[in-house]
């Protein structure tokens, strides 16, 4: 019987002091969760800022690529039609009417300039 009374008194004391600690623990949990949400919010804001910076860099790179793709076409090589409707001849070649192709296709061709 003495043992049961001791265990019951310990149970009552543990219940009483356990509730007091539980209230303190709940306050600590609230503080921790509020701090975590603040940190998460700040981390999220930093991530959004970083994302905006990356998008700006990406758009700048795409503009450069678009500029590269829209460059003028390459020059025409030897025995290729040239003129107003065609690309210019490469360096070292001139756009001339030739006997071989010009009379048939009615357009000048890129040829090596004649010295004469």
From Swiss-Prot:
Q: Which cysteines are joined by disulfide bonds?
A: 75-90, 82-95, 89-110
A GO molecular function held by the record: toxin activity
Q: Where is the signal peptide?
A: 1-20
GO CC, one annotated term: extracellular region
Q: Which residues form the propeptide?
A: 21-74
Q: Where does the source fall among the domains of life?
A: Eukaryota
Q: Which Pfam families match?
A: Toxin_22
Q: In which tissues is it expressed?
A: Expressed by the venom gland.
Q: Where in the cell is it found?
A: Secreted
The entry's keywords: Cleavage on pair of basic residues, Disulfide bond, Ion channel impairing toxin, Knottin, Secreted, Signal, Toxin
- Which positions are tagged coiled coil? none
Major site of localization recorded for this protein: secreted
Would you identify the family this protein belongs to, as annotated? Belongs to the neurotoxin 14 (magi-1) family. 06 (ICK-Trit) subfamily.
Q: What does this protein do?
A: Ion channel inhibitor.
Recorded domain comment: The presence of a 'disulfide through disulfide knot' structurally defines this protein as a knottin.
Identification of the protein by name: U16-barytoxin-Tl1a
Naturally occurring in which organism (per UniProt)? Trittame loki
């Amino acid at each position: 019987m003495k043992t049961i009374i001791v265990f019951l008194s310990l149970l009552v004391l543990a219940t009483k002091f356990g509730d007091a600690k539980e209230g303190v623990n709940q306050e600590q949990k609230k503080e921790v969760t509020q701090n975590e949400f603040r940190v998460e919010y700040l981390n999220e804001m930093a991530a959004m800022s970083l994302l905006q910076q990356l998008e700006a860099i990406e758009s700048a790179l795409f503009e450069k690529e678009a500029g590269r793709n829209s460059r003028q076409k390459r020059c025409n090589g030897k025995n290729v039609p040239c003129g107003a409707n065609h690309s210019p001849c490469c360096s070292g070649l001139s756009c001339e009417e030739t006997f071989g192709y010009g009379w048939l296709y009615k357009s000048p061709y890129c040829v090596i300039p004649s010295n004469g």
